[in-house]
């Protein structure tokens, strides 16, 4: 009878989770690292605590998924409503589809009609909802009206005709009032 050899467990001399850990997750790659290095760290001025983790997710997606994810992240960042998200999708579409490389774009009923016709899945977006969405984008300082009606300047800090973008969200836990009172 042959004896089974046990597979030896992998053992480490140093903690493998400390630096540059890459975790493959489905169609993306998640990289974990410390938030800041050397003198570039976050320090709690009250407690002197120095902590933080930086999670970076890399995903390669097709053009349609890119627009969808980009729009969703902008919507979360600027707290856009459904109308704002849809209007932003039209804005990104016209930049990519028409190859506009200027900071002035048309966003009128004709562009809306072209956008709706170009969608594979039927999308419900009326002219009134589109107008409300454009107002949300103006309020968020993503676009600004041009003197010519139906034309808008785009804020190049938020909207671009590129193929790569990184969003960083820092999540900080609030301390409860009770804990703050006890420490004083």
Curated annotation (Swiss-Prot):
Organism superkingdom: Bacteria
Key words of the record: Plasmid
GO BP terms: DNA replication; plasmid maintenance
Annotated InterPro entries: Plasmid_replication_RepL
One Pfam family cited in the UniProt record for this chain: RepL
Protein's name according to its UniProt entry: 20.9 kDa protein
Organism in which the protein naturally occurs: Zymomonas mobilis subsp. mobilis (strain ATCC 10988 / DSM 424 / LMG 404 / NCIMB 8938 / NRRL B-806 / ZM1)
Phylogenetic classification of the source organism: Bacteria, Pseudomonadati, Pseudomonadota, Alphaproteobacteria, Sphingomonadales
């Amino acid at each position: 009878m042959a004896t089974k050899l046990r597979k030896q467990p992998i053992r480490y001399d140093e903690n493998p989770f400390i630096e540059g850990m890459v975790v493959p997750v489905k169609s993306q790659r998640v990289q974990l690292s410390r938030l800041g290095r050397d003198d570039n760290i976050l320090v709690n001025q009250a407690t002197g605590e120095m902590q933080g983790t930086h999670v970076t997710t890399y995903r390669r997606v097709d053009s349609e998924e890119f627009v969808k994810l980009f729009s969703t992240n902008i919507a979360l960042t600027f707290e856009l409503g459904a109308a704002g998200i849809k209007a932003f999708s039209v804005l990104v579409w016209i930049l990519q589809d028409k190859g506009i490389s200027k900071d002035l774009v048309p966003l009128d009923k004709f562009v809306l009609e072209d956008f709706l016709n170009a969608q594979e899945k039927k999308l419900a977006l009326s002219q009134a909802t589109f107008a409300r969405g454009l107002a949300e984008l103006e309020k968020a300082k993503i676009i600004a009206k041009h003197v010519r009606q139906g034309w808008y300047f785009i804020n190049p800090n938020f909207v671009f005709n590129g193929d790569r973008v990184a969003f960083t969200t820092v999540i900080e836990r609030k301390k409860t009032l009770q804990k703050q009172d006890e420490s004083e």
